[in-house]
């Protein structure tokens, strides 16, 4: 069965595979399974012969046959190498062998590609055969003109003689039960053979290291692949769609897709310039294979293959700039056709029946609906093509966008008054409403696609592509202004439930697309300032702002408001021209927001609005000198704006009322949370800006900080509210510590130290929910910032900080199995050592130069206690904490020579060595085996002689489960090497031998002789 045809009979077809009995089928399956396992561990070599490869492809071709509808049994795949167990008898014997494989796409013998499915029309006549349409002559059932407009770039590529010869040669190795006939039905047991054969081929293909003499062998493999691809993409007469892939075993199609992915990602670069491998014909077949995938997952996998290919082309053109135009021109028709067909596949206009089946409500783990995932996958490939053919890709998108916006902007003529019911849409025909629905959905998709192209219009391409970008942004601004004035989502129609979400989506997506062009607007602003011609930009930007600001009302759909808030933030932060405060609409928005007009909106929208309006006043205006920034006026404006927003919060300063009135205390929680979230958001987003911006921000928030500090004692026993308060203070310490000043910072720290008593800390740590632990962690994070502070300003707090850590927190968390707080506690202790080493070691430079004892140490008992706390963490199962503390010790040794210190050598060194070797013996932290061995080396290298003569014998004497002679052998076999590689190797051998002796001894009966 595995004998390959002789070279002299290559032109002859093999006879049809006879029905296999169970034993013959199992023999073939096990043989292929063994080959797959064999290929996983052998390199490409002469043992893998062309005859063997041809035989494997012989079996791979069986998977191309349509499954029998009479005797197709379920195949149970083995978990190992993909083996298959067939239940039942043999398959149906096939008759009427048809010869030869089909030609490559574009040849007269090839059936036309069918893309989409087009609405509800399933007329078989739409599957017309053509010799030169799109890639494969594509024409959709709903619009043949639209499909043919995309052109036949790849399909019309002439087929080289070598390709035809290769296909014919490959065909000879495949059985006649399907040499191209679409009506052949495969025996059930041959399906599994095809899957197993593809496993073997994929194992070969997954090898990245290919000897040069083996490349011809791989070339033969890929030439044989042409035949299989032609078979797979051939028209079928067994289903109404004419798609053969829909009738094949899903596992086989998946394996073949894996094959294509491996080829493109690993081997295409080897053969892309090889005259014997026609890349364009291969892409034509890959194209047909992509758009005939019967499942969305299969389609996504094929898009991933195209993404890999496009990345390869992009990197190739970038590395060889001289050949950029040649590479681009070679693949331009193919890539344009790819974009055109992806656009068809994602448009409801052509593909409504399939796209309507995609769920657009339930979110997956990536917070995407099924439709959003489908659209994103398509747009990512289009964007990849845009990196290579930016102008051509943009033109394809923009032409459709212009067409759809013409319809959208003309809808107002169909809107008429409807008495007390507002307005109504006069389009009443069902097919016209369906057409409008498709146009609106497609317009939203195109807006999103154009947003992905925004990066191609900025930087050094700004001037070159300015006209296209300007026209597009003008059009988008017009759409936003029109959407805001027309309010089409308020219009009633016979398809209200369908069209209303469509109108909302178009408006929201137009705003989101303009957000993507914020950097282009910023560069436009900059360029207009350079040439002293800002008028055109000012008109455009003002129109956009005036169309966006009225959208912040509760009557506006939430989706539109959210997009508008994101856009406004980008405009205020990225562009921020200086004249905005002079606009009446902007001035009114500050007033409305300050008086609480957006409090009914979602909190995310509120935070975006507050940040946009705050940052416009805090950040320096671009292209203006510091003297022209008008900081004084802006600071006053920001203080007034902040005061309006926080007026109610500042009234909580009277803490006596909060203490006495529990109802007021409870009702104030929401106000405290919202106010502190807003202020925290401001601080976190201003933290990396200039000192001037942070100074104005702190001046506005100074009263908020004081009030928050005053109410903290009231809520110290309520972890949820205390968590928000500590989050705010942590942001203040991280972003505005310099602006607060030393005195005020000291006051805050003293307040915290007084509040966080041992009882309070214990209460928070043991609280039933995680909020209490979060409070303690944030308190420790604030203390960490204090110990990291250079200079002597906060040195007075160091004893108190150590006391809090070791006397109040560590005793509570040390024996708890939960990792909560521990990581932050050890991080604080590490930072304490790293930044305040002289707190323990007072040695001076002079004493070091005079060879005097420079280890004048203070608080040695405390130092040892902290180090023992680190050692305790190495006895616990938490591997993340183990890694963190191991790295901490190594860092301290690198910077401060920790292991060399006398106190460490005398009191701690043996303890740590013992713990680390015990951990290696127990294999409890095997993921860190190498790191632990290196730490053992660094500790032993302090005094190798002491390690070999003192520690090692003592360690062996203390080991249970060993005989005396075994201890002697272990000690003698530990080589006294002093270089790290040899030492760590000795440690690992020592640990393995010791573990082996213990295992052997424990398995012997009592009284047995021990080796």
Residues of each region from the PLM?
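N-terminal amphipathic/basic-hydrophobic helices that include classical n-h-c signal peptides
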Residues: 94-95, 168
